[in-house]
Curated annotation (Swiss-Prot):
It is found in: Cytoplasm. The lineage of its organism: Bacteria, Pseudomonadati, Spirochaetota, Spirochaetia, Leptospirales. GO terms for biological process: arginyl-tRNA aminoacylation. This is Arginine--tRNA ligase. It catalyses: tRNA(Arg) + L-arginine + ATP = L-arginyl-tRNA(Arg) + AMP + diphosphate.
Length: 586
């Protein structure tokens, strides 16, 4: 057993060695042409792992899959140190049941050694950008999902040896930010007694007239939080004085620009506090404004022009994004000379490349899928390999209360924030929120059941895991933590004990595979199955430590120590606490 191998890799290696022996009698068959893989058994009664090797390669071997399976089983059965049992089931699946003694040995060298996770051979420097919400308001529920998953992805990648920088991109430049400032200014003037009106969607009134007449733009922000910000600004003496002066001088555009800056900073502070309460810390906050101020945005267009990827039409400069799968070529500089958001985004990713990242991963919202090909194309144009840039789409979140959807809308002011959700869920808001957001694959919409999230029984999947951890801690408070690997080796192995040992031993490979696939939900799914295996063990005959003989107690305690470690580490990677005591254990 090598230190850096998962149990699955060990079994696969044994299978490959078995295939080497098998194909000696097939001189015309090259091993490289064979499909050799293993997977978890779909039904635990057949074993721990299985392979469909015989079915997938029977044509190439020109032999019946059942006959191939029989020959392979005969070879692999000789590995009695690793396998308790190797057999096959028609039409040609070979099943592996791992020896309990091997499981115990593996657990000692991995789970109980303090170094739980195999490390990658070549660690990468990775930039992982997520959340990156516009600074136009507090973080919403979709951002909360991205925050929980992005932070967990970073933890998983770090666990297997990569160097990861978590980055938040601040869109603090452009028309939406200006409209945010205009919206705040409207509320300030309302507070000071001025009358305001709201622009209709089809109204084409010029912006200077809108500012002069104190009109809230159709695309402005109407949430109550804008009024709160306006009041806060007026309560700051220095800013209040600036506001008073500029209003008297009727310098509305200048004041709107100032309000944009102030409101953005207020919202960023709000967002950081929300993220902190959610246990999410970023290594870098990168401002879009710095790209424009340093002329990096227009500079990257020249890079694209040099390689022939820009053409002009009607005074616009257009990127040939259709060459990379986009449905049409995209404008990067408008006919008035202003760069589009796409060009700024290309400049931002060029900056990432120049910072020396081996991999660039972005998590985007549900309405950005069509944006991938054009940005990926630009990144390739800049000389970055396509496979080293990856975009993960975080799909929509539906909040459900009593089975009904709860509506969300930022501009209309009727939306639920991350802060609202954490507060709604009470003192367990962080743990419950983070776990619920990683329970499902990011590429699928998530129905967030508020009723289940508030349930503090073990029907709630978060509490189910935490109760399991607290239960083990309670056992150790009762009988002590003394344990023995030798005593564990001497235990009579019931099915419940063997099942739990296998689920413990799976932990490193589950983390390794989840990190490599960047799928945090796999950890959540694994932990649920693990806790189920522990519950079966806990309720099983002769597994109560307090009732066991001293020797059996030492062996069972060894298994429980490993189980506690898996739960604590697994929950920690998701950003969920593992309490030693719970008010209710049911």
């Amino acid at each position: 057993m090598k230190e850096n191998e998962t149990l699955k890799q060990i079994v696969l290696k044994s299978l490959e060695e078995g295939v080497d022996s098998l194909i000696v009698s097939f001189p015309d068959v090259e091993k490289s042409s064979l499909r050799i893989k293993i997977e978890y058994s779909r039904d635990e009664k057949f074993g721990d792992y299985s392979t469909s090797f015989s079915l997938e390669n029977s044509k190439l071997l020109k032999r019946n899959p059942i006959q191939v399976s029989k020959e392979l089983v005969e070879i692999l059965q000789k590995r009695t140190d690793l396998f308790e049992k190797v057999d096959f089931t028609p039409p040609g699946f070979v099943n592996f049941k791992i020896s309990p003694s091997y499981l115990l040995e593996y657990i000692e060298k991995s789970i109980l050694s303090g170094d739980h996770f195999p490390k990658v051979e070549h660690p990468l420097k990775i930039n992982l950008e997520f959340v990156s919400a516009n600074p136009t308001g507090p973080l919403n529920i979709v951002s909360a999902r991205a925050a929980a998953n992005g932070d967990t992805m970073a933890s998983l990648l770090k666990a297997i040896g990569h160097n990861v920088d978590k980055e938040f991109y601040i869109n603090d430049y452009g028309n939406q930010v200006f409209l945010l400032g205009v919206s705040t200014l409207v509320r300030i003037r309302e507070i000071k007694g001025e009358f305001s009106t709201r622009q209709e969607a089809d109204d084409t009134t010029p912006i200077d007239t809108i500012l002069e007449k104190n009109i809230l733009p159709a695309e402005g922000y109407r949430g109550e939080y804008i009024k709160d910000i306006a009041n806060a600004l007026l309560n700051e003496p220095k800013k209040s004085s600036q506001i008073e002066t500029l209003l008297k001088e009727k310098k509305y555009r200048e004041l709107a620009e100032l309000c944009s800056i102030w409101t953005v900073e207020n919202n960023l502070d709000w967002q950081r506090k929300d993220l902190d309460s959610f246990g999410v810390e970023f290594d870098n906050y990168f401002r879009e404004r710095t790209l424009h101020e340093s002329d990096k945005v227009l500079a990257v267009m020249k890079d694209l022009e040099r390689v022939g990827k820009i053409f002009e039409e009607d005074g616009k400069k257009i990127f040939r994004s259709t060459e990379y799968g986009d449905d049409k070529d995209r404008v990067v500089v408008r006919d008035d000379g202003r760069p589009t958001y796409l060009l700024a985004d290309i400049a931002y990713h060029k900056d990432k490349i120049e910072r020396g990242y081996d991999r660039i991963y972005d998590i985007w919202g549900p309405d950005h899928h069509g944006y991938i090909s054009r940005l990926s194309g630009a990144v390739q144009t800049l000389g970055y390999k396509k496979e080293n840039f990856k975009v993960i789409i975080s799909q929509q979140v539906n909040l459900l209360e009593s089975g009904q959807k709860v509506k969300m809308s930022k501009r209309a002011g009727s939306f639920q924030t991350m802060s609202d959700l954490i507060g709604f869920l009470g003192k367990h808001g962080k743990d419950v929120g983070r776990y619920f957001f990683v329970m499902r694959s990011l590429d699928a919409p998530l129905d967030f059941d508020l009723d289940l999230a508030q349930d503090q029984s073990d029907k709630n999947p978060v509490f189910y895991l935490q109760y399991a951890h607290a239960r083990i801690c309670s056992i150790f408070r009762e009988v002590g933590t003394e344990s023995s690997a030798e005593a564990a080796e001497s235990l009579e192995m019931s099915e419940e004990r063997k099942r739990l040992l296998f689920w413990i031993a799976r932990f490193p490979e589950e983390i390794f595979d989840s990190a490599n696939s960047m799928e945090p939900h796999r950890v959540a799914n694994y932990l649920q199955s693990f806790a189920k295996a522990f519950t079966g063990f806990y309720l099983g005959k002769n597994n109560r430590l307090k009732d066991a003989t001293p020797e059996v107690r030492l062996g069972l305690a060894r298994i429980c120590l490993a189980a506690r470690s898996v739960l604590a580490e697994g929950l920690g990677l998701i950003g969920v606490s593992a309490p030693e005591k719970m008010e209710k254990e049911s």
